Amino acid sequence: MGMTITEKILAAHAGKASVEPGELIQAKLDLVLANDVTAPVSIKELEKASLDAVFDKERVVLVQDHFVPAKDIKSAEQSKIVRDFARKHDITHHYDVGDMGIEHCLLPEKGLVVPGDAVIGADSHTCTYGALGAFATGVGSTDLAAGIALGEAWFKVPEAIKFEYEGKLPEDVTGKDLILHTIGDIGVDGALYQSMEFTGSAIDDLSMDGRMTMCNMAIEAGGKNGIIAPDKKTIAYVEERATRPYKVYTSDPDAKYARVIKYDVEKLEPVVAFPHLPENTRPVSEAGHVEIDQVVIGSCTNGRIEDLRMAAKILQGKKVHKNVRCIIFPGTQAIYKQAIKEGLIDIFIDAGAAVSTPTCGPCLGGHMGILAKGERALATTNRNFVGRMGHPESEVYLCGPNVAAASAIAGRIVHPREVE
């Protein structure tokens, strides 16, 4: 019996010829990631254990992104813990104010994750890197601490679900719409502890930015990881950035899947997820009259240059509705600079939007766009749980950047074509 791409990567990192679903393995790691929220917990435990050195100062990545620049004393103290640890252990890849970015936008951009890697991160959206053909998954601070010290982690090999997306994507349908449609179909626990393998002609047509959006939200269906086999687009992207050698894996023709789910993408339209779960999806044409108070465009899901270009194309020459606050935050400093170079930031500001430094802030209800009681936000982020972006009696709706930009103009949730 053949193996899936995820099984092959895990087998290689466990030093085994093969693995099968349900098997417990100890795997060597290529990269261990943490941020200003999750790292301090691990650091305190490592200091209690008198850690002399991290397993590899080149393979531990610390990204200050959740509360950066620090919003209050507590967040400043957390950042200092990370900063001091990075200096003490001479961590090569520590990203702080000025050179930071949202971690899951930053690492691919820096070439720190490559095809065939095994990566853990103390952030649930670490699964983003599956778009590069890597096994990447989120862990808690205990497993993170072990990873920092030893460069290893244990896993139960997940079953796999194969998702086949066939047909040509309609003009207004994005990778965000594909993954929201999928989560709406299978539910937020539809892929619980399973590998979500995205395939098909529609995936082939997606840009790398679109693929990262899809893999980013695998966790929202309960997935252990999301993954897309590398192709020419992947290799072209990686070759420009890779900081080390890599190995490409693909699934065998006779690999075993728990399920195979097929979608005809030509029938799809832009999707909106209603409160309070990403599975509560509707085509935007069926959204009804939903007025909004705030629009957020950015995050590790949709803060890449393609997303900003899409939003700018719609906002150009128009104005954000008088009752809407529109906040746009590029995923990294490099993306921010590229957006300036292309004139996108001018378009956003002229339209009446606020542009933020790269941060996770509003996505987790941390800062830079908190919702008050009774307010509604439409966001290109990845979660819309109760109280996710502020008051527990606020509401969050999820969508792609084109729907977000159009709705910012209209003051209510609309199809992008309604504001052309």
Curated annotation (Swiss-Prot):
GO terms for molecular function: 3-isopropylmalate dehydratase activity; 4 iron, 4 sulfur cluster binding; metal ion binding. Its cofactor is [4Fe-4S] cluster. Its EC number is 4.2.1.33. InterPro entries: Acnase/IPM_dHydase_lsu_aba_1/3, Acoase/IPM_deHydtase_lsu_aba, Aconitase_4Fe-4S_BS, Aconitase_4Fe-4S_dom, HAcnase/IPMdehydase_lsu_prok, Homoacnase/IPMdehydase_lsu, IPM_dehydratase_rel_enz, IPMI_cat. [4Fe-4S] cluster binds at residues 300, 360, 363. Transmembrane segments: none annotated. It catalyses: (2R,3S)-3-isopropylmalate = (2S)-2-isopropylmalate. One of its GO terms (biological process) is L-leucine biosynthetic process. Binds 1 [4Fe-4S] cluster per subunit. The keyword Amino-acid biosynthesis applies. Pathway: Amino-acid biosynthesis; L-leucine biosynthesis; L-leucine from 3-methyl-2-oxobutanoate: step 2/4. Keywords: 4Fe-4S, Amino-acid biosynthesis, Branched-chain amino acid biosynthesis, Iron, Iron-sulfur, Leucine biosynthesis, Lyase, Metal-binding. It comes from the Bacteria. CDD domains: IPMI (cd01583). It is an enzyme of class 4 (lyase). Catalyzes the isomerization between 2-isopropylmalate and 3-isopropylmalate, via the formation of 2-isopropylmaleate. Belongs to the aconitase/IPM isomerase family. LeuC type 2 subfamily. Heterodimer of LeuC and LeuD. This is 3-isopropylmalate dehydratase large subunit. It comes from Heliobacterium modesticaldum (strain ATCC 51547 / Ice1).
